[in-house]
Amino acid sequence: IAQINPKMPRTHGDGLIDVNQINYAVEVNDEIPELPIIDLSEQELAIGKNCAALIENGATLQMGIGAIPNAVLVALQNHQNLGVHTEMFSDGLINLLETGVVNGKLKKVHPNKVVASFTVGTRKLYDYIDDNPEIVLLDVAYVNDPSVIRRNPKVTAINSAIEVDLTGQVCADSIGTRLYSGVGGQMDFIRGASVSEGGKPIIALPSITGKGESKIVSFLKEGAGVVTTRAHAHYIVTEYGAAHLYGKTLRQRAKALIEIAHPEHRERLEMEAFERFKTLN
């Protein structure tokens, strides 16, 4: 059974269906649900700038969903020859494509194309991808395959977190035992980026919650799910900077993460880290 809607964008890729596969068709003329663009806060813009500083010219980008990935895209106006291989295509990419910042010419897999598995955004986005051969939407099982992801150069995967502990464990799907969201493709792209030549897996998050609680914590909440293990954590970014964790001891990691925590929480985190590790040297 097929629903035919002229307001639905026609996308290139492997989503085409042969008319002979359709038994029944229903015609509608409904508006497509939109995700409005929200103004970015100074905190989010700072996080985006810190992430952008880690992104090299010629990198292949994967961005998660939300304000922080959009803030990263805003900060990439002066980059060159970027490519995109991502789970989700969002409004923030349009300007980078129109200005040539994103052209995909250095990609090894699907060069000169933006590869994604789904898209959500405004009507402008849907109109942009409509019958646009530069945008290719492919099966998520292929797009998120680490063995495919790694083949592109300098894959830089930017994903979010709910909280990160002082050893680098990343919780991204729950608040304690309460599920908050799905894990999405975080594990796939963090791994794919880590084995890409010159790749950089990045976890980006605000230093505090809206209630002022630190999102960098000594221990994850009881029952919290670890989506990215500390063995796979490379870069953690907040509005206060970036901590490079890969190859460092747990003590060195704790010290680096405290340096990018909110200033109001650093002294307490230092005391808790010292209690746990006895030294931060």
Identify what each model region corresponds to.
Residues I1-N281:
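Conserved phosphate- and dinucleotide-binding cores of soluble alpha/beta proteins
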